[in-house]
Structure formats: structure tokens, C-alpha cells
A protein has these predicted regions:
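Eukaryotic partner-binding/assembly regions in large regulatory complexes
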Residues: 1-102, 113-114, 126, 257
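Positively charged, polyanion-binding regions of nucleic-acid-associated proteins
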Residues: 28, 32, 94-124, 181-200
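Short amphipathic alpha-helical interaction segments
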Residues: 55-62, 146-162, 210-223
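Short, amphipathic alpha-helical interaction segments positioned at domain boundaries
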Residues: 90, 98, 174-213, 244-257
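Inter-helical turn/loop segments and adjacent helix faces that build the functional surface
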Residues: 121, 138-147, 170
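DNA-recognition alpha helix
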Residues: 125-142
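A short, conserved structural fragment
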Residues: 161-171, 225-231
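Long, low-complexity, charge-rich intrinsically disordered regions
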Residues: 225-226, 231-257
Length: 257
């Protein structure tokens, strides 16, 4: 039985230090191994070998800590990503987006609920001011000061821009949706199969964030290699051709066939 991780539900401030960082994330998963995710040895190696270019030791430490939480914390993900060196950029950005959603509940709500609701409500833009007010609403326990909420708003919008959900870095920012390659969707489905999360495999903030809901999910899943889904009313049945995410990557390499 594949070990199952759980999406993170406790709010934290890691996003204030490390946003999406798709290029650095790729450098991490190409070089890191599951057995090297404890202690400072990997941090030292990343610094000496310039995994992330000419970064300071504190910055390398922050990146490694973030990427461990986003990728290494989910069984099989790091091995699967290491086995997919020729991943296209569109897929890589989405993989980083979904892993950030899994590991950060505020980013998950922002991209999977708040931005979705704005689109559905006919609002075509988003600005920093309304995002700050939204953060104040969801921070019902008063964890963060006004200045911290303002920092969160900037970082959320920056990450959303990098992921393809907003078109610019200046207000008002037009809402957009990234293209979802079949290989990216296949990765997400096999990943979620081994994760405990709120929702179902066909209805969740990970799919909603990229504009996939209802029949659009069914249509897109037909293009994904290595799995099939039959839905009858509210009942869905998945057929998985591979035992794990890593097996799926090794057999399909994100194929759209």
C-alpha cells in the first residue's frame, strides 16, 4: 500500500520567503534524493554546487526548506520528478503550483476559491487592496498583523502571476488561466491518488484553480495516458494503469496518447 500524505491545513508564513520558484524547484528535484532530505548536508551541497546559482547560504537554506515541504513531503513525488528530466515548462509551472497548493492552505484557498469566485462572478481583474481585505477575512484568528497581511497579498499575487493566473504585476491585474497539458493533469491525478485532501478526485481546489470542473474534467481526462474515469451520476470509477506516480511517469513521461 502506497503511503499517503495529507495536504497541509495549518497556516504558515513560508510563502513570504519563497514563492513559486519554478526554475529553482526544477534544479532541486533534479539533484535532490529522498534519502538526502534530513539535516544540513543537502543545504551545504546545494550551496557549494550552486544548485540555485550564486545565492547566499541563508537563501539556499530557505529554498531547500520550502522545496522539502512542497515536494519531498509527498511520497513518490521527488522520485517521479527526478525521472522526468524533459518536462516542458508549462507542465513544470503547474506541478509547482499544485505542490504549493498542497503545502500552503492560504495559497490553496486564494487560487482554488478566491480567484475562481471572481471569475465566476464576472470580475476580470484582481488588485492588491481587495486581496488584503480577503486575507483579513480568512485570518479569523488574528494571527497576522496588517503589515504581514499586506506582505501576503503581494506574495500571493506574485506566485499567481508566475503560475499564470494573473497577467501582470501591476494593479488592476487581468485574470488568466494557464494551459493544462495532458501530462500535467496526469501527474496531478496520480499525485492526489496518494494524498488525503478535502474534496474528491473530480472536484477539488487543485482542478478548480486551473478552470477544470464538471464535464470539462471528464473531457480533459480522456486525453491523459495511464488512467480512465467512468462517471455515472455522482459515482465515479477510476482505472489506474500504474501502481504509483513514479511508475506512471516512467511509463508515460507525460504522454498525451
Amino acid at each position: 500500500m502506497v503511503e499517503r500524505a495529507t495536504e497541509v491545513v495549518e497556516p504558515h508564513t513560508q510563502l513570504l520567503r519563497v514563492t513559486l520558484e519554478a526554475d529553482n524547484a526544477r534544479a532541486y528535484w533534479q539533484r535532490s534524493t529522498p534519502g538526502a532530505t534530513a539535516g544540513d548536508q543537502e543545504v551545504e551541497q546545494a550551496f557549494v554546487e550552486f544548485w540555485f546559482g550564486a545565492r547566499t547560504m541563508p537563501r539556499v537554506r530557505a529554498l531547500i526548506a520550502a522545496f522539502r515541504a512542497r515536494f519531498a513531503a509527498f511520497p513518490g513525488a521527488l522520485a517521479a520528478l527526478h525521472a522526468w528530466p524533459d518536462m516542458d515548462r508549462a507542465t513544470r509551472v503547474l506541478v509547482c503550483h499544485w505542490h504549493l497548493q498542497l503545502s500552503d492552505p492560504l495559497y490553496r484557498r486564494f487560487t482554488g476559491d478566491y480567484l475562481v469566485e471572481r471569475r465566476q462572478g464576472g470580475r476580470e481583474t484582481v488588485s492588491r487592496g481587495p486581496v488584503i481585505r480577503w486575507i483579513a477575512e480568512v485570518d479569523d484568528q488574528g494571527r497576522w498583523s496588517a503589515s504581514t497581511r499586506a506582505q501576503f497579498a503581494s506574495k500571493l499575487l506574485s506566485a499567481a502571476h508566475s503560475a499564470g493566473f494573473v497577467a501582470s504585476i501591476r494593479d488592476p491585474r487581468a485574470l488568466t488561466l494557464p494551459r493544462v497539458p495532458a501530462g500535467a493533469l496526469g501527474y496531478l491525478m496520480y499525485l492526489l491518488r496518494s494524498v488525503v485532501f478535502a474534496g474528491s478526485l473530480l472536484d477539488n481546489p487543485y482542478l478548480r484553480s486551473v478552470g477544470l470542473a464538471g464535464s470539462a474534467v471528464d473531457d480533459k481526462l480522456r486525453t491523459v495516458a495511464g488512467l480512465s474515469c467512468r462517471r455515472t451520476g455522482d459515482v465515479s470509477e477510476f482505472t489506474w494503469d500504474h501502481d504509483s506516480l513514479e511508475d506512471w511517469v516512467r511509463h508515460t513521461r507525460g504522454s498525451t496518447a
